[in-house]
Amino acid sequence: MPAYNIVVFAGDHWGPEVTAEAIKVLRVIEKSRDDITLNLQDHLLGGASIDATANPLTDEALAAAKNADAVLLGAIGGPKWGTGAVRPEQGLLNVRKEMGTFGNLRPCNFAAPSLVEHSPLKASVCEGVDFNIIRELTGGIYFGDRKKMTAAATMDTEPYSRAEIERITPRAHLALQHNPPLPVWSLDKANVLATSRLWRKTVTEIMAKEFPQLKIEHQLIDSAAMIMVKNPRQLNGIIVTSNLFGDIISDEASVIPGSLGLLPSASLSGIPDGKGRVNGIYEPIHGSAPDIAGKGIVNPVAAILSVAMMMQYSFGRFDEARAIEAAVRNVLESGVRTGDIGGKATTSEVGDAVAAELEKLLK
């Protein structure tokens, strides 16, 4: 019987509220399946860790995360720690670096069909949107040299190596998990930037060599940003892009489903091809929202769907992943929702409903 070790970083403010509901789902899976054991370890990260230890990430917590099979994260940060020399985000950046999570995966779709009415886009524009953004996390301008040249001028540099691009591109293999395979989009600014020309050249060569059966299309980032508002279904499939462009385009995509409380993400340390262990950090894309924490009104769906991603990418448990998604869909369609998507249910009521529905689906 496989035993999976999961480190839980509940984090700050409403982080513990949403991870509590995600853990309910994990417990249902363990109860309903004889061939899986889940060992959960609670550790502090971010502001909670600063308050307890004066350190946003202790050596003990880091070691546990690196040795785990997966990490479940709630949310970190808040104005309480925002201007200090020691900040919550330092802990998160450190754990990502030490775990080697060089790629981030963010899906953009509707967890339930009726949620289309909550999108800021017209239903005729956004209905059927379903793409995944794969963002390179460890290269580019965020990790380049910074220089203050004069009092009125500064400079940031964007370095990218072929090796970094070669490492992220094979994640497009996720397109092969569908029949027929999904199209793959690579976003860059090759008409202006030298790094983007290297990006396009490398992506083209890697895709032709390793995935000749997949269709790859190149799109300029500014054009893609326009398409995402005008006709986002055109981008359905797998989107691969650099750190800066991925940061911006994934935030643009996040508004399509209508609430940040609906969208999960995964930062992975390898290629989830079933050939080896792939640790990852699974978390909702929203922040810690101190203004509504503790009121029982936050949406736990993104945290619950992060567990579905964990089941699929770190554990290779596709049936359980699809069951979680179906449970969420059924509960939302039944009208059990938090206020951000037109309902009146509390955080725990949504979590309880999803757990109960999942238990029925797994019988």
Swiss-Prot record:
The record marks 142, 189 as: Important for catalysis. Its cofactor is Mg(2+); Mn(2+). GO terms for cellular component: cytosol. Mg(2+) binds at residues 222, 247, 251. Binds 1 Mg(2+) or Mn(2+) ion per subunit. It is found in: Cytoplasm. The keyword Oxidoreductase applies. NAD(+) binds at residues 78-89, 287-299. One of its GO terms (biological process) is L-leucine biosynthetic process. Pathway: Amino-acid biosynthesis; L-leucine biosynthesis; L-leucine from 3-methyl-2-oxobutanoate: step 3/4. Its EC number is 1.1.1.85. Keywords: Amino-acid biosynthesis, Branched-chain amino acid biosynthesis, Cytoplasm, Leucine biosynthesis, Magnesium, Manganese, Metal-binding, NAD, Oxidoreductase. Belongs to the isocitrate and isopropylmalate dehydrogenases family. PANTHER family: 3-ISOPROPYLMALATE DEHYDROGENASE (PTHR42979:SF1). NCBIfam families: leuB (TIGR00169). This is 3-isopropylmalate dehydrogenase A. It comes from Aspergillus niger.
